[in-house]
């Protein structure tokens, strides 16, 4: 994705808009930090998918909206009602069930929401446009990533050694599939409350969960199922509370207009 972003932006944006963030070190640091976080997030996800941990990624992204909500309340002082507290408690209970049973924290299921929620919080503080922000997230990390890829290829254990050329080309350009939703997320992170972003976060883990069970046939044991159910209860409480809160705001707004 970095190659695509870094190629498209200079063609579609005036140079003054591209270099403007360089004048603000704080903003530049925010964007580079966001790039590091999302890279770590993606790397964890890719490792998990390739090591039979798809259900853990689904679990992590179910928890992620609650982390986003918590950061929204702590950092941006967004209202933190009782339904949000209950939802986070249920999510914590789900993680605790896995901890007690497996005698270790579900690392993937915690790394993904923590890194992505922090990424969302940083993006909300970025002043640059969504695409320019993505450009700086990628441009400073590209040399490191390219050096790593070259090292793996020269060592004989890179993608070229494992797949044919057509698949390798698809891998190189698959970043475009990621660029579009991430650009849209960047727009949403700047213009929507983190609570709203959190609710929309349910779609991805649901699709991932279904793929893990129905397509890749990962083992869903009783303990993991119970953990999912506990977290789903928390999400139901959270969603219901958000809907009622939204309706209340609309009702008050309507009365004020009258």
Predicted regions and their residues:
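Transmembrane alpha-helices of multi-pass small-molecule transport proteins
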Residues: 1-40, 115, 136-153, 233
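Transmembrane alpha-helical segments that form core, pore/gating elements
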Residues: 5, 9, 103-157, 248-258
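Loop-to-transmembrane-helix transition segments
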Residues: 15-40, 44, 107-111, 159-180, ...
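C-terminal transmembrane-helix exit sites in multi-pass transporters
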Residues: 47, 64-83, 206-225
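Hydrophobic transmembrane alpha-helices of multi-pass small-molecule transport proteins
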Residues: 83-99, 112, 223-242
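C-terminal-most transmembrane helix of multi-pass membrane proteins
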Residues: 202-258
């Amino acid at each position: 994705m970095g190659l695509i972003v870094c190629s498209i932006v200079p063609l579609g944006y005036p140079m003054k808009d591209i270099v403007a963030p360089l004048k603000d070190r704080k903003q530049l640091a925010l964007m580079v930090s966001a790039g590091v976080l999302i890279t770590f997030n993606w790397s964890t996800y890719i490792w998990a998918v390739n090591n039979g941990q798809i259900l853990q990624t689904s679990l992590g992204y179910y928890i992620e909206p609650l982390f986003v909500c918590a950061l929204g309340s702590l950092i941006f002082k967004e209202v933190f009602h009782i339904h949000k507290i209950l939802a986070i408690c249920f999510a914590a209970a789900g993680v605790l069930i896995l901890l007690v049973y497996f005698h270790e924290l579900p690392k993937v299921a915690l790394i993904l929401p923590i890194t992505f929620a922090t990424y969302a919080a940083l993006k909300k503080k970025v002043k640059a446009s969504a695409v320019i922000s993505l450009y700086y997230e990628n441009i400073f990390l590209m040399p490191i990533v390219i050096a790593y890829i070259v090292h793996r290829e020269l060592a004989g254990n890179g993608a070229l050694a494992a797949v044919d050329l057509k698949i390798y080309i698809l891998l190189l350009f698959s970043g475009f599939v990621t660029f579009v939703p991430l650009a849209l997320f960047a727009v949403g992170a700047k213009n929507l409350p983190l609570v709203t972003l959190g609710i929309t976060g349910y779609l991805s883990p649901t699709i991932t969960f279904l793929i893990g069970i129905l397509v890749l046939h990962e083992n869903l044991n009783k303990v993991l199922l119970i953990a999912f159910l506990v977290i789903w209860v928390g999400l139901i409480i959270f969603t219901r509370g958000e809907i009622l809160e939204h309706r209340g705001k609309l009702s008050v707004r309507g009365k004020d207009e009258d």
